[in-house]
Amino acid sequence: HMSVGLLAHVDAGKTTLAESILYLTGSIRKPGRVDHQDAFLDTYDLERERGITIFSKQAEVKVGEKEVALLDTPGHVDFSAEMERTLQILDYAVLVISGADGVQGHVQTLWRLLTRYEIPVFLFINKMDQEGTDRQKLLEELQKRLDERCIAFEEEQEAFYENLAMSDEAVLEKYLSDGTVE
């Protein structure tokens, strides 16, 4: 069993991602939408009315044979204390970033908190279909403003392994010795 938290700056699409995960894992029959006020994890009237997550919520999902507690946290700065309480129990975090907005100040704050709590982080870049987004520029911004070890999951597996190996000394040694990172 593992605990995975979803964190984001406001309007990055975190709740929409949570709905998609719940739907694709078979936990819900139909994904809700923030603008339709029927998101599964936004259970309080005020959350539905304002279209924001105010309280952290948990949903249990099954991914393969693994049981996962998915924790949806508030993205609005006013509810940061609620989000931060959740960090103490996370095994992993997914930091959702709007590709259209780039690395916002609150994203940097979330990154520092996740680093302080030593929580491994997967970045999920959302809204890349919006006009003006540039994948390479965003990756460079992530590396400059968050961590130089941020890498993209490449479609080409070899390129991904090379980038991954460059982010950690032990992984690099393994990759150089036998061509794998596992």
Model-derived regions, located:
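P-loop NTPase catalytic nucleotide-binding module
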Residues: 1-12, 99-182
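P-loop NTPase switch module centered on the Walker A-proximal segment
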Residues: 1-97, 103, 144-146, 150-152
